[in-house]
């Protein structure tokens, strides 16, 4: 028969042994939480693992009881990110992504000519949904362009009802005698507005001066405006240096103001020369002088080789320099051969 004292002592030792086998704080699992979370647990106490928001369990146990051994069983629970649905194809745009898992972001961009109607990025939420919603790519349009003062639409073809699409162009022109400052063509931009509009300004030019030894004609009106024209001419024996017609430009000046150049009096009475590739006689072709800008070739003699060569002479505003090698042939020296009749060197 066991002594009551011995039995009580044995029970005490057993209680101490059992009470001493507590479980430690459980291992941390990626993306999971433990309830209740303590530093130690008595045998028989339970814990429950839960995946954090945005994550779901893939295999393994979630509920555990602290055993008498004081050692937690091996935990094979896996918490993995939620996966949001495929974002789909963004019509007229592109979706950029690396993953559809929580908490990844995806971004959106539209093709040229389209703009994002919605957000530029979306996030995979804890619930496995995209937020904000997936956007759409809408066409970029520009409203009808404002017409500048004193301007008209020269070429306007809206391609979206009354609106124009991205990169559509409009061409303007100014009313007569108004000068356009800027580009006559504007374009619908990616911001949905037009590039800078031109201006149409009234431009006046002063009356063109009459060239010395010449004349000028222009419209008989109080003011000469942009695109008005003036014509010039010279008196006899003078030649116009420059175009016969000038135009009032958008800067308020004339495109050109020509001058009248004096003709050249040839100090040679008689000679055969080359003019425009033909042999002509000075006394016949240039009896009234040689016009400014004209050029002729005089024949010169190479006495050693008994042949001829030509030297150019140019009339410049009443002045011409006769080549020093040229010798005017005298009709009295009939036995001498004129240089123009010799064989070319």
Swiss-Prot record:
Residues 21-81, 82-139, 140-202, 203-262 form the Sushi domain. The lineage of its organism: Eukaryota, Metazoa, Chordata, Craniata, Vertebrata. GO terms for biological process: blood coagulation, intrinsic pathway; negative regulation of angiogenesis; negative regulation of blood coagulation; negative regulation of endothelial cell migration; negative regulation of endothelial cell proliferation; negative regulation of fibrinolysis; negative regulation of myeloid cell apoptotic process; negative regulation of smooth muscle cell apoptotic process. Expressed by the liver and secreted in plasma. PROSITE patterns: SUSHI. Its main location: secreted. It is found in: Secreted. PANTHER family: BETA-2-GLYCOPROTEIN 1, COMPLEMENT COMPONENT-RELATED SUSHI DOMAIN-CONTAINING. GO terms for cellular component: cell surface; chylomicron; extracellular space; high-density lipoprotein particle; very-low-density lipoprotein particle. Gene3D superfamilies: Complement Module, domain 1. InterPro entries: Compl-Cell_Adhes-Reg, Sushi/SCR/CCP_sf, Sushi_2, Sushi_SCR_CCP_dom. SMART domains: CCP. Residues 1-19 form the signal peptide. One of its GO terms (molecular function) is phospholipid binding. This is Beta-2-glycoprotein 1. Residues 263-345 are annotated as: Sushi-like. Binds to various kinds of negatively charged substances such as heparin, phospholipids, and dextran sulfate. May prevent activation of the intrinsic blood coagulation cascade by binding to phospholipids on the surface of damaged cells. It comes from the Eukaryota. Disulfide bonds join 23-66, 51-79, 84-124, 110-137, 142-188, 174-200, 205-248, 234-260, 264-315, 300-325, 307-345. Glycans are attached at residues 33, 105, 117, 162, 183, 193. Keywords: Disulfide bond, Glycoprotein, Heparin-binding, Repeat, Secreted, Signal, Sushi. SUPFAM superfamilies: Complement control module/SCR domain.
């Amino acid at each position: 028969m066991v002594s009551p004292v011995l039995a009580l002592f044995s029970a005490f030792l057993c209680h101490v042994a059992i009470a001493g086998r507590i479980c430690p704080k459980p291992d941390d699992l990626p993306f999971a939480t433990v309830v209740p979370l303590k530093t130690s647990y008595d045998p028989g106490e339970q814990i429950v693992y839960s995946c954090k928001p945005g994550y779901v369990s893939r295999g393994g146990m979630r509920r555990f009881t602290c055993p008498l051994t004081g050692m937690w069983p091996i935990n094979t629970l896996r918490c993995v990110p939620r996966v949001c649905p495929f974002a789909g194809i963004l019509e007229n745009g592109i979706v950029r992504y690396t993953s559809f898992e929580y908490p990844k972001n995806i971004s959106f961009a539209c093709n040229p000519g389209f703009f994002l109607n919605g957000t530029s990025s979306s996030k995979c939420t804890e619930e496995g949904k995209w937020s904000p919603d997936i956007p759409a790519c809408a066409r970029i349009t520009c409203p009808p362009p404002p017409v500048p003062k004193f301007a008209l639409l020269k070429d306007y073809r809206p391609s979206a009802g009354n609106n124009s699409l991205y990169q559509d162009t409009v061409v303007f022109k100014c009313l007569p005698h108004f000068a356009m400052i800027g580009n006559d063509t504007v374009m619908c931009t990616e911001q949905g507005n037009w590039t800078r509009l031109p201006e149409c300004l009234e431009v006046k030019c002063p009356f063109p001066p009459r060239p010395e030894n010449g004349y000028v004609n222009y419209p008989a009106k109080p003011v000469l405006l942009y695109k008005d024209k003036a014509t010039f001419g010279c008196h006899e024996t003078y030649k116009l240096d420059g175009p016969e017609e000038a135009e009032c430009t958008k800067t308020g000046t004339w495109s050109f103001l020509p001058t009248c150049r004096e003709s050249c009096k040839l100090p040679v009475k008689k000679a055969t020369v080359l003019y425009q590739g033909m042999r002509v006689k000075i006394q016949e072709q240039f009896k009234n002088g040689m016009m400014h800008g004209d050029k002729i070739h005089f024949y010169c003699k190479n006495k050693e080789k008994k042949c001829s060569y030509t030297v150019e002479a140019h009339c410049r505003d009443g002045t011409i320099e006769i080549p020093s090698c040229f010798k005017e042939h005298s009709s009295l020296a009939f036995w001498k051969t004129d240089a123009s009749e010799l064989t070319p060197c």
